[in-house]
Structure formats: structure tokens, C-alpha cells
């Protein structure tokens, strides 16, 4: 099985943001996860430890997969096409993206 490169993942994130339904930000992601919404959470590598623990706790309860991206929050924001840092994003609908195929679950 071929492991996806970071460029493939970055492109999949951007396509999901452009064509699908994605929630940006840790507070909104956690809120939606608590309501059982979302198909995949992507967390930046430098996300705050306490926030990351909350995300992992609620995703475990809701059985939502989590992918820890190797990019910083500033880089993840740029990947999403935003001029601000993004520590976490929740994919509600992937659109034309293959983002749900990432399998680096922690």
C-alpha cells in the first residue's frame, strides 16, 4: 500500500475546503464533534496540548478519525487558502476530495 505524500494530503485538504463543507478552528470543530457531526478531524502539529487532548477525547467518544498533519497551524491555514492560522479543521463533507482516505490515525 502506497503511503500518501504530504503534497497529496495538502491538495486533498484544499479541494475539501473549496468543494466540500469544512469547519475551521478548534472551538467550532470540538462543538461539531460533540454533536456527532464530521467525518475527519485534521490537527496541526503545533496545536496546543490541552486543545489536542480535548479533540482526541471527543473524537474517541464520537468515533471520528483524527489525522495529525505535520504542518504548523500557519502552514495549515495557508493550505486552506486562509490568511490566518488554522490549528484544527473538521471535514463535514469532503466534496470532490479524497481526504477521507488518509489513514494516519493516532
From Swiss-Prot:
GO cellular component terms, semicolon-separated: cytosolic large ribosomal subunit
Gene Ontology molecular function: RNA binding; structural constituent of ribosome
GO biological process: translation
InterPro entries reported for this sequence: Ribosomal_eL30 (IPR000231), Ribosomal_eL30-like (IPR039109), Ribosomal_eL30-like_sf (IPR029064), Ribosomal_eL30_CS (IPR022991), Ribosomal_eL8/eL30/eS12/Gad45 (IPR004038)
Keywords annotated in UniProt: Ribonucleoprotein, Ribosomal protein
Highest taxon of the lineage: Archaea
Family under the similarity heading: Belongs to the eukaryotic ribosomal protein eL30 family.
PANTHER family in alphabetical order: RIBOSOMAL PROTEIN L30
Cross-referenced NCBIfam families: PRK01018.1
HAMAP family tied to this protein: Ribosomal_eL30
Descriptive protein name: Large ribosomal subunit protein eL30
Organism this protein belongs to: Methanococcus maripaludis (strain C5 / ATCC BAA-1333)
Source taxonomy: Archaea, Methanobacteriati, Methanobacteriota, Methanomada group, Methanococci
